[in-house]
Amino acid sequence: MSPDDAKSAADGTSVPENGTAPKLSRKPSQKLPRGPPPLFDHLPDATADACDTFQVINDCLYGSKNMGSSDHDALDCDCAEEWHDGQNHACGEDSDCINRATKIECVSGDCNCGEGCENQRFQRKQYANVSVIKTEKKGFGLRTDADLQANDFVFEYVGEVINEPTFRNRTVKYDKEGIKHFYFMSLTKSEFVDATKKGNLGRFCNHSCNPNCYVDKWVVGDKLRMGIFATRAIRAGEELVFNYNVDRYGADPQPCYCGESNCVGFIGGKTQTERATKLPLATIEALGIDDGDSWDTAVAKKPRKKKAHEDDEDYVNSVQPRALDEDGVNKVMATLMQCKEKWIAVKLLSRLQATEDEHLRHRVVRMHGYQILKTTLNTFKDDTNVVLQILDILYQLPRITKNKISDSKVEGAVEPLASAAHEEVALAAKRLLDEWSKLETAYRIPRKKHDHAGPIPGNSFEEERRNKDREEPAKPTDPFANIVIPTGPRSTIPQRNANFFAGQQRPRKPPTNLPAGWFVNTDKTGRYYFYDATGRTQWQRPLTPAIETPKVSAKAQQDQKALQSIIDSLTKEPTPRHSAGHTPQRSTTPATEPKKDKWRSLPLEKQMKIYENTHVVDRFHGKLPKEELKKFAREVNKKLVSSDYKNNRVEDPTSIPPKQAKKVRKYAHDFFDRAVAKYTEHEKKKAHNPSKPTSGVPPGDVASSAATPAKDDVTMSDVEADTSPGSSAGRKRKRDGDDEHDDPAESPGAPPSETPSVKRIKEDDAEGEGEPTTIPPPPTPPPPPADTPPTEEDRSMREQEEALMRENEEAQRLEDEAQAEEGGKGSHEWNGRYHRTCAAGERAVEWRVGNGWCYGDDGHGRAAATTAAAAATAAAGSAGSLKTTLACFAFAPC
């Protein structure tokens, strides 16, 4: 289908016989009924064949290290970490993340949201599941193999980032090579992404007059990157398409094969321009147009006659923008941050300037307002009107403290304007600086340095920051409002010195919510590393739980602890008491953790005696619950040790005389017999009266009532043990040479019944009941990761990038030389949107003057280029005019 046929079918007009271009219609667009989008899931996967036509690269290659720069400082969001199932769900699609709203990706380590948030799609290359298909008329196309939701990330547009001179050279070069399809995308005003020969699958996304995708630019680190996103919900099997938007640059119409009901039959040219001005959807929404359809209708109702200079700016001026709301603030700030066209920036600033809602002004400040306005001020500092707009907006913004102003460094951009030659600019700048000078910098509580080897609490300070804009509920009356409450002791840290922490770098937040069994610590340089209980270390954040050693069954573990408690109590020397007149001395033996199995090194005779006493407890396993048995065993230990020390029976704490061992066995038997009887009686009463509370002692106190010994030398309470006159230090004999068996954790004032071994038993029991995670001591950091040698692919990419840099430098050098030679002669130059017409003969030529170029066409769709001198000669010797033609689908003005 030829362009003429398409036009004839579109508006019912015939093509003139003389071959002149048809007069394109300016009828208002109408919403046509649209059926379900066609599916292409029946077409075979042609990805392998498509990848043979170009070189696949994973990331952009830059013509210089400064190309693709975002011109923005690192901006962090105020979201808090949201860990679920080992994944950080902060900064999601439905969150109120200010970075996501302003099209900035969070960078791990620099943001409050923690590592691995959901606003890192470019960095993680979270592309959609797509495949390449072979279409009937459009060549290769891109198909989604899974359902997509609105705003889902499809693919990053990757290629070679080149400057404008290289871009112009390549358009001519590709045409000479017979390349039919160019893949240029405008990254900035003078930078382009060329995916013609090097790119990824995103280059196969075709054009459509009814697109289901859109192209957007995001700030990722210090670079500006371009991605393709879903406009609406897309079914698996649909072709992914977006609007190429070439008409803004004066391209001649090309046949369009999208097949949509609203297809105008051409890509570019007057047809699309007069039906609707195709600004990016995000820019349209930021300008205050309701949606694409209303925008389409509004601009189509313009008068039929349009002067040659009328363009997007004139159309926008004819449309009344809607009132600014909270969502509109997000879109305005996001578009303003990347805006390089003055007339769009003026419109966006006018919307901010006109708002009087204090809540919306607070929203502007929160959405990185000071940083974005500073960047816009630096971009358009030569335009007095734009500067006055920005200074007025800055003056209107609410200000309580100077913190955000200082953090954004906007003062550095305003201060030079105070001495500007323009009187209004100087007065506005001085007024603003004077207001800022009256503000105080609020003291900020520094972030707490967490114990990285222990559990990491939540970030309550950042949570407070995130919720500061929310309305607080009414607080109840404070009963102590009129009472002066004394404050605590002063800290040695200066509390009101605003500059105390000014020179310190903000500490990075330690990783939180690690998989089970993993812990975090820092090395000497402050770098985090991870370790588990086995001593394994690594630099990378673990994604799976640590491999745990097989655990002993609960029953066996409890039995072992009950037996060990008795063994430890009988083999340890209790803490010696000091008399009132004796000053406790510091132990000269360094504190070391006592060994739990030290009884194994004792003589066999002693081990047998310990086992005899242990066997008594073992006999009652089937008669008492495990927890009660453990508690009774502790009661036996406490009473026996207290009684022996009170009556001076201890001659050697590491051995028990046979006579005393017999008494211990008898007492233990009697104790447990009474305990079993009491427990059985209690259970019977409980069974007969299930709803009536028993008047006796609870099950946990059976030991207290059962422990009524027959002899006075055994009835020993804790109070009596503490007040006994016989508990002097002289009676607590210690054998020389047994220091290795002493418990260094014993305190001089601890009673025998509360020896550290008993305390440790209680801790062990609590550990068995609650199973808290014990934190092992951190091992030494792992060795630094070795610098792996670059792979062959890495070396190849580096060589290609260096070659691209040389190509850009050479093109820029030739451009500068041509400008110096020509000195700006001539009248034909690029005006920012369209090329001026240039005179030509039968064969039009490309004529460059200064920074402007005119693209000629020889009548057969081939671009022609020559030197400036030859172009001038051809132009001077012939007459006529010719519009430019561009073979690629997206350009930016010079």
Curated annotation (Swiss-Prot):
Record key words, sorted: Chromosome, Methyltransferase, Nucleus, Repressor, S-adenosyl-L-methionine, Transcription, Transcription regulation, Transferase
Catalytic activity: L-lysyl(36)-[histone H3] + 3 S-adenosyl-L-methionine = N(6),N(6),N(6)-trimethyl-L-lysyl(36)-[histone H3] + 3 S-adenosyl-L-homocysteine + 3 H(+)
Compositional bias annotation for Pro residues: 774-788
Compartments where located: Nucleus; Chromosome
WW domain mapped to chain residues: 512-544
Keyword Transcription: yes
Gene Ontology terms: biological process: methylation; regulation of DNA-templated transcription
Entry's EC annotation: 2.1.1.359
All residue ranges annotated as the Post-SET domain in the record: 252-268
Gene3D superfamilies registered for this protein in UniProt: 2.20.70.10, SET domain, Set2, Rpb1 interacting domain
Domain AWS, residue spans: 72-126
A Pfam family assignment: SET
One annotated Gene Ontology cellular component of this protein: nucleus
InterPro entries xrefs: AWS_dom, Post-SET_dom, Set2_fungi, SET2_Histone-Lys_MeTrsfase, SET_dom, SET_dom_sf, SETD2/Set2_SET, SRI
Record carries keyword Lipid biosynthesis: no
UniProt biased composition (Basic and acidic residues): 462-475, 792-830
UniProt-annotated stretches for the region Disordered: 1-44, 447-494, 572-604, 678-830
SET domain location: 128-245
GO MF terms held by the record: histone H3K36 trimethyltransferase activity
Class of this enzyme: transferase
Polar residues bias locations: 582-591
Primary role: Histone methyltransferase that trimethylates histone H3 'Lys-36' forming H3K36me3. Involved in transcription elongation as well as in transcription repression.
Domains (record comment): The AWS and SET domains are necessary for transcription repression.
Family affiliation: Belongs to the class V-like SAM-binding methyltransferase superfamily. Histone-lysine methyltransferase family. SET2 subfamily.
Protein name listed in UniProt: Histone-lysine N-methyltransferase, H3 lysine-36 specific
Organism the protein comes from: Chaetomium globosum (strain ATCC 6205 / CBS 148.51 / DSM 1962 / NBRC 6347 / NRRL 1970) (Soil fungus)
